[in-house]
């Protein structure tokens, strides 16, 4: 894939292909592991006319057409010993973290419903982003107070069983404006098409981690004192579904102390889900496989012959271009779907 640029140098626009670089793009939907940034390392140029960033003077958009690997360069690191310059920036998703969703004046929460594209257009977004029309809708949804557009939109689309894709795509006659389009799409269940395992092929590295210290019993402690304190017991069944029905002998047991909450059950369920999500982690490094953020894939442990469905929540794309030689590598992180 070719990494392209659109540069604005004091109002003079130019565009083209980046050459001779090492790039690392990190994109994620994981609210507990928010990266969504990139680095591009190049040799120091011989003149400032070749720079791709200079504060208040040079702005540059980089992108791989039709993918999420792109964004705005927002900084640079110059190493005179190595004679290199490393450009840093936020991916398209990363720009969503720069904006805050606030409740409307006089209201406790921002509450929305209806067409998802219409809703997104009413939220604070970067001027580099546009929202494509969609037929997807949502019922009544309440945003948390004062959260980033990234977190709010991610939760909104998850609730609607949808996902988003952000990228620059050109069609005949289009101008190189540097505007990326947000497209709302269904979550793609690829478990019947894509299975990864240790014996998949020579191009895959699979790491499956299981934490057997994940609690099977969570005691949630809320408001009140001593015998009057609110206490809720939550359990995980054999399939790690959260239930309130007591399971005799369930262990390990943990305590969740949240005396400030007025919604102990919902907060306790949320905390328990976070713990369970960390019970099984699957990291995949693979080449030549069509996977995108939000896809559901199947992963098989060769030793136990156990299959689990996992959602792609993080993709790292690494690319090196040495002129006559080019390499690409993808690393995927997942969360097990239950």
Model-derived features: where do they sit?
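Solvent-exposed edge beta-strands and adjacent loop segments
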Residues: 1-33, 197-208
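Acidic, small/polar-enriched beta strand-loop surface segments
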Residues: 4, 186-322
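Amphipathic, non-transmembrane alpha-helical segments in extracytoplasmic/periplasmic proteins
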Residues: 40, 89, 102-130, 144-171, ...
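Surface-exposed cap/loop segments at beta↔alpha junctions
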Residues: 47, 54-131
């Amino acid at each position: 894939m070719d990494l392209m640029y659109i540069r604005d140098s004091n109002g003079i626009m130019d565009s083209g292909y980046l050459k001779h670089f090492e790039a690392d793009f990190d994109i994620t939907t994981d609210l507990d592991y928010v990266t969504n940034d990139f680095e591009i390392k190049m040799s120091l140029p011989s003149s400032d006319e070749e720079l791709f960033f200079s504060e208040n003077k040079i702005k540059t958009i980089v992108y791989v057409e039709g993918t999420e690997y792109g964004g705005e360069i927002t900084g640079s690191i110059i190493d005179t010993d190595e004679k290199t310059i490393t450009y840093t920036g936020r991916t398209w998703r990363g720009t969503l973290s720069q904006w805050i969703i606030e409740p409307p004046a006089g209201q406790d929460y921002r509450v929305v419903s209806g067409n998802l594209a219409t809703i997104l257009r009413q939220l604070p977004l970067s001027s580099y982003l546009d929202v494509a029309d969609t037929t997807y809708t949502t019922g009544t949804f309440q945003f948390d107070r004062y959260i980033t557009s990234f977190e709010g939109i991610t939760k909104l689309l998850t609730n609607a069983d949808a996902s988003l894709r952000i990228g620059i795509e050109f069609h005949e006659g289009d101008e190189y404006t540097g505007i990326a389009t947000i497209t709302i799409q269904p979550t793609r269940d690829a478990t019947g098409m894509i299975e990864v395992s240790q014996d998949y092929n020579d191009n895959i590295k699979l790491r499956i981690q299981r934490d057997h210290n994940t609690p099977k019993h969570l005691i949630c402690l809320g408001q009140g004192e001593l015998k009057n304190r609110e206490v809720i017991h939550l359990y995980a069944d054999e399939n790690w579904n959260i239930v309130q029905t007591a399971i005799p002998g369930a262990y390990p047991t943990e305590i969740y102390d949240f005396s400030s909450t007025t919604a102990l059950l919902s907060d306790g369920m949320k905390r328990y889900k976070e713990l369970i999500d960390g019970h099984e982690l699957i990291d995949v490094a693979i080449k030549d496989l069509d996977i995108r953020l939000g896809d559901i894939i199947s992963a098989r442990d060769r030793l136990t012959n156990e299959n689990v469905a996992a959602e792609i929540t993080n993709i790292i794309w690494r690319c090196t271009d040495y002129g006559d030689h080019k390499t690409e590598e993808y690393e995927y992180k997942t969360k097990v779907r239950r």
